[in-house]
Amino acid sequence: PSLTLGRISEKRPGHEIRMLFPKLAWPARPGVARAFNKASRTPVDAALAEFRQEMVEFPEQRPEYTWDLRSDWETRHKGTDLISGIMTFGSYTGGAHPNPWLVSLNFDLRQGRAVELAEIFKPGSAWPARLSAWCLRELKARDLPDPDSGASADPRNFVVWTMAPQGLTILFPPYQVAPYAAGVQEVLVPWSEVADLLRPGGLAAPLAGLRS
């Protein structure tokens, strides 16, 4: 399988769009490639639709400044079973600074679908509490003012994540655990910290060195 970058570019008076997103080509398994490309385009298309809708609803604002929408992709891991990466979005429609957000894509090449974080763990296991404890310890060591609520043991706090041989990375967008100026906060959770909770035969097991 070959992973490249797709691009959507548009520059007109009053607005500029530059979207980069991953595209998978896999002649041997075209169905998997189509599923991956649909998964990667979904958040891009949603961002474009919202941006264009705002341009229609608030046309009077744009002559004062240029509206901007961007996305970038970073591959964190590409293996025979998994593609894991982060899409970073940013839109500027006025205000003090751009509005950033993150979308992760963890795609199981065996099954041809994106996976949720809960799926790499044993059903019913206390993975949110385990991740919360590790992340809070790491975040508090950075002297952040109040990371507790944004990294509590709520599964909704861990929706942006990637996997690689060195561990599970949790990403917290601006405002979730720190002020905007602190930027995105990343916490690497070594596989050794959650190995006992991983689903046997699951997508993370080979990365963690666990045998089926």
Language-model region placement:
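Compositionally biased intrinsically disordered regions enriched in Thr/Gly
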Residues: 1-212
